[in-house]
Amino acid sequence: MGSALKVLMVGNSFSLSCRSYLPDIVKSLPDCELKLEIAYIGGCSLQRHIREYETSRQDPEHRPYTDIADRPASLQEFLKRDRWDIISIQQASHCSWQPATYEPWAEKLITIIRETNPQAEIIIQQTWSYNAGDIRINTAQDEWGLDQAGMFSCLNAAYRSLARKYAFRVVPAGLAVQLTRKDSPRQLPRMDEKLKTSLVYPAPLPETDDAAGRCWYKDSDSGKILCADTIHLNRYGEYLQGCVWAGFLFKVSPESITFEPADLPDKARLAKYRSAAEQALQEYSV
């Protein structure tokens, strides 16, 4: 422990969630400093990163990403902004469980990174499976033919295969989320259109204790529920992700983290998530 790191995440909303608590967690660690930047496009797959890079190469005014401060930029600009110590990559969640979607795009992205930042260590963030209320994975008979555990099993295998191929280290955020599910926290009910159209704000809405699944969106006029987020981390999940990343980057035990956000009052849940982060870092292996 005790170091300064410059980290660039090339990803999507599953990396953007690191900005919520990771910086404050690192500030609470003795003698640790983090410069964090996130090259973000919502739902961006490895394939799309390459497509956007090529478009920006042809048209330098093409800036499809936003950074950690919500400013537009191209991937080329991100890669040249600093001499990065660590650059992370990840697959988009909706295809993370499909191994065939990783290549040749991962190899192309890795080549681009190595050409511009040969000094940087490239790592992988393992993403997570959705809240079980998501209609694509609510049961193994749904659209993807997977339930929550099945989605994690597939994405875990896909990320592990990628890591083995390139000898990359992995930030096991997805494993940490999965470990918090061992005691069967409340999942959202099946969030199909029939249920959503029956819900009217501010009537009691289904709740979840899972790390994923975070908020409701409603029509401002009728109050009818339009969408339920079943895929992104909620605030407690973002704290979990921050603990995993802090432990990984600075080689500290997440259970030793003392920072607890003022907006997260459930201290027992925070402690549980620190323990899950610790367990994930200890147990994960390629």
Q: Which residues does each predicted region cover?
A:
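N-terminal secretory targeting modules
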Residues: M1-I38, M191, I257-V286
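Conserved SGNH/GDSL esterase-like catalytic core that processes O-acyl groups on lipids
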Residues: K6-L8, L16-A106, I112, P118, ...
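Alpha-helical cap/lid subdomain in secreted, periplasmic
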Residues: A73-R235, S256
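Short loop/turn hinge sites at secondary-structure boundaries
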Residues: Y53-P60, K182, F250-E255
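Extended, basic/helix-rich recognition subdomains
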Residues: K218-A276
